[in-house]
């Protein structure tokens, strides 16, 4: 390939400011000299018109005869602007908050949602922000909207609800790459709210309720099974030890007397309880082992 033929990216970059910087011609120097002479003649009145104050968080892009002076922004502090030939534009370098209004999005699983967000960005190159784009803030705002719709359109509803941070980071990376030539650096992207249709909300709530009920039934069944195992073990211990049964009997009487002190309890003798059961502990011991 001929080395004189440049790639599309190279040609694209050459259209931006800062690549082809030409000095002032003869006419430019003549106009510059006349403007400077005018300042000297009208001194000290002209000095108040030529001196401009640039704040700490601002930069001034000075155009001299239509060309950016010194190929960089000036400030902070005092700058000199010559009359008739110099024009300057102030650029705020502080972080800007860009609220993205609710965007109607069709997800990958064919669910219509409304998603809004916020983008935090700042200008790091005042020259690029002024010379490479007409309205840098409006361009960033529109690009943030389209990027949000494009990225969320490739995700399912469950992925959007569960992976907000990953999606926001992906949007931030795409925006940062796209706005680099505009002198913009995207600091952070946040997805504020995801609105889904009311009917879908009801179906999701019913599904979640059914899942919770099924989980509760499983836990209750496991608890009853564990309790039945414990009761079985306790009954076997009490059957093997009549003294333990008597102690349990006395403990129950003490508990009833403490909790319900207005109730009079007449304890039955153990031999009567054994008679009601149909067999005494002594007879139980005398029964032959069927095994």
Curated annotation (Swiss-Prot):
> Which coarse location class describes where this protein primarily resides?
membrane
What keyword terms does UniProt attach to this protein? Cell membrane, Membrane, Phosphoprotein, Signal-anchor, Transmembrane, Transmembrane helix
| Residues with Phosphoserine modification | 7, 241
GO BP annotations, alphabetical order: signal transduction
GO-annotated cellular components: cilium; membrane raft; neuron projection; plasma membrane
Q: Where are the transmembrane segments?
A: 29-49
Give the matching Pfam families. Answer: Band_7
Please list the residue ranges that the record places on the Cytoplasmic side of the membrane: 50-291
**Which SUPFAM superfamilies does this UniProt record tie to the protein?**
Band 7/SPFH domain (SSF117892)
Which topology term describes how it sits in the membrane? Single-pass type III membrane protein
Compartments where found:
Cell membrane
Protein family according to the UniProt entry: Belongs to the band 7/mec-2 family.
What is known about what this protein does?
Required for the function of many mechanoreceptors. Modulate mechanotransduction channels and acid-sensing ion channels (ASIC) proteins. Potentiates PIEZO1 and PIEZO2 function by increasing their sensitivity to mechanical stimulations.
Question: What interactions and quaternary structure are annotated?
Answer: Homodimer. Interacts with PIEZO1 and PIEZO2.
Q: What is this protein called?
A: Stomatin-like protein 3
Question: Per UniProt, what is the name of the gene that codes for the protein in this document?
Answer: STOML3
């Amino acid at each position: 390939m001929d080395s004189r033929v440049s790639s599309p990216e190279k040609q694209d970059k050459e259209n931006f400011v800062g690549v082809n910087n030409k000095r002032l011609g003869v006419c430019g120097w003549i106009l510059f000299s006349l403007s400077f002479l005018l300042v000297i003649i009208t001194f000290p009145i002209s000095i108040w018109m030529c001196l401009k104050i640039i704040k700490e968080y601002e930069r001034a892009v000075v155009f001299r005869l239509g060309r950016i002076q010194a190929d960089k922004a000036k400030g902070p502090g005092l700058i000199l602007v010559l009359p008739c030939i110099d024009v300057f534009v102030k650029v705020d370098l502080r972080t800007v908050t860009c609220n993205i209004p609710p965007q109607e999005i069709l997800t990958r699983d064919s669910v219509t949602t409304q998603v809004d967000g916020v983008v935090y960005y700042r200008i790091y190159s005042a020259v690029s922000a002024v010379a490479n784009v007409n309205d840098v803030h409006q361009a960033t705002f529109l690009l943030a909207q389209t990027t949000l719709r494009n990225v969320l359109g490739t995700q399912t509803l469950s992925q959007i609800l569960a992976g907000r941070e990953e999606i926001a980071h992906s949007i931030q990376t795409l925006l940062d790459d796209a706005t680099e030539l505009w002198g913009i650096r995207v600091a952070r992207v946040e997805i504020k709210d995801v609105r889904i249709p009311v009917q879908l909300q009801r179906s999701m709530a019913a599904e979640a309720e059914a899942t919770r009920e099924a989980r509760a039934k499983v836990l209750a069944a496991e608890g009853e099974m564990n309790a039945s195992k414990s009761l079985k073990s306790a009954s076997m211990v009490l059957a093997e030890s009549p003294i333990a049964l008597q102690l349990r009997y006395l403990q129950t009487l003490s508990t009833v007397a403490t909790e319900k002190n207005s109730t009079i309890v007449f304890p039955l003798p153990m031999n009567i309880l054994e008679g009601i059961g149909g067999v005494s502990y002594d007879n139980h011991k005398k029964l032959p082992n069927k095994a």
